[in-house]
Amino acid sequence: WMPEEIHKQKAHWHLPLIESHESIGRKVGYWSDWINHPNYDNYWHDMQPIDENYSNIKVPALSSAGWFDVFLQGTINNFVGTTKFSKNQVAKHNQKMLIGPWVHDLGDRGTISIVGDIDFGPNALIDIRNLEDRWHEYWLKGINNGIMDEPKVKIFVMGKNEWRESNEWPLRETQYTSYFLHSDKGANSLLGDGLLNTLPPNNEKPDIYIYDPNHPVMTIGGSTCCAEENLYAATIGPRDQRINESRPDVLVFSTPILDKEVEVTGPIKLIIYASSS
């Protein structure tokens, strides 16, 4: 972290980004390196990232994350990757994953039910420390406490506000469904006609918005890091997005009002075609 006497806001708003550290009188070599390598190339490959080395992992692991954790995808990747690619049979067959309705750096996760703007109810409360103690007792002390007889995956289903257990991820019963973005006059803001449904588009015009770097769309909640007490950190967790969705430089695509429950659990992939002037 930078010393408090440094005016962080000046660095945050400075353009171009590659010069932001210099704007506050600092020289941060790795920052320049990161900006100069925006895509995956040999610079990143030489760091031997874990997702290219799952075959070398030799230890069992209990991985936990939150649905609003900035490192959620890494946790999922590690569970799936080690289970699938580890050459060590002990590691390969002894991975567990826990995902709850949490954010990153929340402290004792599982001890509160309110995250962001939503109260996930009493079912969200869980004794994670006890789970960790049982894990360590089994693997470090050899105490057969039954933890390895339990399902490998435990996730909290938000909305239903209940826990679900499985031995694999993605869940076996997952029904992959394609949704498509549509608009007629334009999807700009809540007042636009952006639509999300399962019908493929047909000869539709592209949506256009104007981006002003001096008036950016500010992050409201989501998978952010790390603490709201930090003046310069974004808010965390699920938040009402209508403030941002009222802006003309935000495209909004919504489904019609649902007439039945729809659960969204599993990996999501977006294919988008875009260009910039």
Segments the model singles out, each with a brief description of its role:
Residues 11-18, 107, 112-277:
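C-terminal, loop-rich substrate-recognition/catalytic regions characterized by aromatic stacking residues
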Residues 73-95:
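Active-site-adjacent alpha-helix of alpha/beta-hydrolase-fold enzymes
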